[in-house]
């Protein structure tokens, strides 16, 4: 098979499309023919550049944490999947490892993954769409409902309305019966939140975020603040917008990561701040069901051949606003 591998940290040019041995399924694994895998700012671009050493990745390495495709081989102990099944791989692995981090990922024509990390994908959901959902859906679900304990009738502020974690969060929260306030750094990006079903949208480049939230909520504030950016100018305003006993959840910090926090607000308001970038495969199931029923849409910038991965890494480094990029090894 061919795979995109890097043998040293560095610029996008360290990525090489090379022949590697075909993977063989272990007893609890499956081998997947990859049809889609995404390019992530941290889990791909930063790791390849060597600017995310805390993940512990050492070259040589094949990136790609969220492939989707078709099962072509199953291990002897695998009973939940069969050859021909359409699947997506979620990052969490049995024993606490992370697919694409502690093992080779899916930037390849074939990949091996634990069967327990795979989720079946219904025919109504395309592979590119499935890859975005497998990467961001379980994390969004975990943040909103497992950590954030969001309930129908509560109000949630979601930053990054046009991003994938934000856009999926908006749709999941709205489907659960919450009042959703979407916020972004431009009018166009905030409008995406409204288009996805948010009750209110705020362009925080034009207004003070806290003032806008207090106007919308008649001074009450929000029950839950969902932020995966950590913008040091905006995140504190979100925290200040929480009502007493409010909760903040996060799984990202590419806009920071250091944010000034008024701890007097935290303890006087008895706030809870929680972070967790991980999730479980079962958290993907309601997301895939919603997508198959037409109730969850994802934002995809482009789908290109896997061979173009170096150019896509360079594009993502040069343009912080570029959307989700999907690599498809069946295109070349």
Segments and roles (model prediction):
Residues 68-70, 85-86, 110, 155, ...:
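Residue-level marker of beta-strand positions
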Residues 246-251, 260-300:
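Rossmann-fold dehydrogenase core element
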Residues 191, 196-270:
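Glycine-rich cofactor phosphate-binding loops and adjacent beta1-alpha1 units
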Residues 86, 130-207:
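Mid-domain Rossmann-like dinucleotide-binding core that forms the NAD(H)/NADP(H) cofactor-binding site
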Residues 1, 281-332:
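C-terminal hydrophobic helical "lid"/dimerization subdomain
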Residues 90-160:
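NAD(P)H dinucleotide-binding glycine-rich loop of Rossmann-like/cofactor-binding domains
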Residues 21-39, 51-93, 122-124:
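Glycine-rich beta-strand-centered segment in the early N-terminal region that forms part
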